[in-house]
Amino acid sequence: MGKKKVHITSLGLLHFLVTSGRYAGRGGGGKGSDMRFTWLLFLALSNCFFCSIVSAKPAKAHCKNPYFWRCYGVPHTCPPGCPKFCQVDCKICKPYCACDKPGAVCQDPRFIGGDGIMFYFHGRKDKDFCLVTDAGIHINGHFIGKNNRKGRDFTWVQSIGVLFGRHRLFVGARKVSRWHAFDDNIHIQLDGADVEIPSGEGAVWESRGAGLTIERVAAENDVVVEVTGLVEIRARVVPITAEESRVHGYDIAEDDDCFAHLELSFKLSSPSPSLHGILGQTYAPDYRSRVKIGAAMPIMGGEKKFSSSHLFATDCAVSRFGTEGEEEGNELKTANVAKSQ
């Protein structure tokens, strides 16, 4: 909003000055009037130019791990592919776009598989789909969206439900009409109870009983969730901006619903060979991508087999959750058969 207001003010002033200049030229006024007009015109043009430059300036990021002392705290300019938000690889001390790394789920869901191949899975708005499923962990995503008169619905991941052990973790974006960057719009619950993370970048909330740690990567809307021995999830709440709506044709009204959603990045600690789900399957050792690699928008199908009845359901057709004992039993049977032979 700030940029738009400044441009309107600057251009309005410019229009006023040009109009005034025409009348001044007709009615005279002497050198003093001409000089004042020229000076004000210069200021108006400078103001427009300056605001355009400042608003386009990319964001900065830095390494936050003091172990990498050579890189720690060093500011880096975000790459052109993600000028508003990026992360720094502390090992090589270079910025990168988090949404371009394996394990990412961003935008109108755009996935980067464990094999490094990018694909889209659109699903359906107001429905839940299995993202990752394994014997010890199950992660569903709730999709929100908007009708598209030209074809499929536009969809985004509004929240995730993580099941591990006997626990249920909810991480979601609150519904907001007008986006304010300094409002914390991330909502987290563990087993139905709200999680109140202390304020401030670097603040940590921990549940030792659940083996769960949540850290604020930024003061608002950006956290890293770690389930010990299973998964690390980075979750960031972002809106659909007016520029994105214009470019992609989302047709989102400014004061209606900015469709706040999650940008996610998953790091799986010890995935089993039977790992499945929209994203999980791409980590399986025998997985072969079925998407059209050369397509402008490669689509992952299989909506029915990934569909779940609700956010914490494990009833999708490819569910693996809770099968740890079965897998161990099958391995034992195989071993006994081998010995008998």
Regions found by a protein language model. Give the residues of each.
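Secreted, short cysteine-rich peptides and small extracellular cysteine-rich domains stabilized by multiple disulfide
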Residues: 57-100
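A positional/structural detector of protein chain ends, strongest at the extreme C-terminus
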Residues: 1-4, 37-38, 339-341
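Intrinsically disordered, low-complexity N-terminal regions enriched in serine/proline/glycine
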Residues: 14, 22, 33, 49-50, ...
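Low-complexity, Ser/Thr/Pro-rich intrinsically disordered segments found in N-terminal tails, propeptides
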Residues: 50-72, 113-115, 122-123, 130-133
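N-terminal leader/presequence-like segments
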Residues: 22-26, 31-35, 43, 52-54, ...
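Intrinsically disordered, low-complexity basic segments at termini and long loops, enriched
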Residues: 1-33
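Cleavable N-terminal signal peptides of Sec/SRP-targeted secreted and luminal proteins
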Residues: 8-19, 36-54
